[in-house]
């Protein structure tokens, strides 16, 4: 996979990670400087020329929800505050409160860590305006890598991170109607 980065295409994986998957590259790219000049899949191995199965283009990078409508699905992006970090997991309560966790520190080095938003709780979905009426940030430290949310009791979720640690978090207003406390 290649991505566009400052006017050129770069492999999504680092030289070391690609070498682990394709050992033939160890001989072809003996230095990081040589690997840095890679522009497409044909540079990795000429045998790949013309064998790429498919090319895809991503046109929408915002996080949001898809609403089921009579004529198909409609994408509704989250607010700008919710676009500042990746979204790792989403929990939707029976009354419609949406809770998500974000942040991730282990991207490839070109992309850097994503520590802008640990997560939020979004309350009071307005079908007419297609937006949530209230929101609150989660009481989480930026240095965790949250992965999974599950409800354990009214107003309380359990969060699992990448290292297997579990953390109980209280979400104001969860299962208490749509009001933020």
Enumerate the language-model features and the residues they cover.
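Acidic, glycine/proline-rich Ca2+-coordinating loop motifs
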Residues: 1-181
